[in-house]
């Protein structure tokens, strides 16, 4: 299956990238999914200029993207601290404070700076297919073409603000080989949609230290050959291609999977 189809699929609900006219994008959305509002997660996508006045991912949100762990850690009563190792924080130094860049850094070489062009035109990692998306209509068309159906759904996280300590309450598998769409941390509204071979997506119910209940989209990669080897070893003391590695997905991203139930198009 072509990744282009996956890409737009994922980005369809999530990456209604406001580079084209907002009204036409929303009209097209409604023509396919009547009475289905765009999720709050995608509020920036309603900006006609396709550009925000500040970076979309704030400093306090970066830990949502920098917590690596093993698949066997996904079980009830497991404790997690977001951004749980000093080594991870030092390895992904371009993303430890809010600056332009890409938050999903486990697939990147370690660089102090990265432009939008650097990322979007860089080679893909092993087992990865990626695409930067800037047109809502083309995304929708490709998603529907890929699945052959409009029955798809986007799943995202809703981490509690200013909370970084959580206990797992429940784990639910939602699908294999999902397409992930990440908002890139640039003022220009662009999403990176990528698929990595041999992945499993979960929704993990969490309870924060203050009692707030939340859900975290989680992805486990069974093929890790394309990951950043330095980060992977420093965080978990494992080498590429040896064991499955998992990570949470922050609030400014979503996974697209087929919708086999009567659920709403976009959830969480």
UniProtKB/Swiss-Prot annotation:
The keyword Signal belongs to this UniProt entry's keyword annotation: yes
Name under which the protein is recorded: Unknown seed protein 30.1
Record domain BURP: where: 68-259
Record keywords, A-Z: Signal
Alphabetical list of Pfam families matching this protein: BURP
InterPro entries per the UniProt record, alphabetical: BURP, BURP_dom
Native source species: Vicia faba
Signal sequence extent: 1-22
């Amino acid at each position: 299956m072509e990744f282009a189809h996956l890409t737009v699929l994922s980005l369809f609900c999530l990456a209604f990238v406001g580079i084209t006219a907002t009204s036409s994008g929303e009209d097209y959305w409604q023509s396919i999914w009547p009475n289905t509002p765009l999720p709050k997660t995608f509020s920036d996508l309603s900006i006609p200029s396709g550009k925000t006045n500040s970076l979309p991912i704030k400093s306090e949100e970066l830990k949502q993207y920098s917590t690596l762990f093993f698949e066997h850690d996904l079980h009830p009563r497991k404790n997690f601290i977001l951004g749980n190792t000093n080594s991870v924080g030092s390895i992904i130094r371009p993303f430890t404070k809010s600056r332009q860049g890409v938050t999903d850094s486990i697939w990147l070489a370690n660089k102090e700076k990265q432009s939008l062009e650097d990322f979007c035109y860089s080679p893909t990692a092993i087992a990865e297919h990626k695409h930067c998306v800037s047109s809502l209509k083309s995304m929708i068309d490709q998603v529907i073409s890929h699945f052959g159906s409009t029955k798809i759904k986007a799943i995202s996280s809703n981490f509690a603000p200013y909370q970084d300590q959580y206990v797992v309450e429940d784990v639910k598998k939602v699908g294999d080989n999902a397409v992930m769409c990440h908002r890139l941390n640039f003022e220009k509204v662009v999403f990176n949609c990528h698929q990595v071979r041999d992945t499993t997506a979960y929704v993990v119910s969490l309870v924060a230290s203050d009692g707030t209940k939340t859900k975290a989209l989680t992805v486990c990669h069974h093929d890790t050959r394309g990951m950043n080897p330095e980060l992977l070893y420093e965080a978990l003391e494992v080498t590429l291609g040896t064991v499955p590695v998992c990570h949470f997905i922050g609030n400014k991203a979503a996974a697209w999977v087929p919708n086999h139930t009567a659920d709403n198009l976009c959830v969480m």
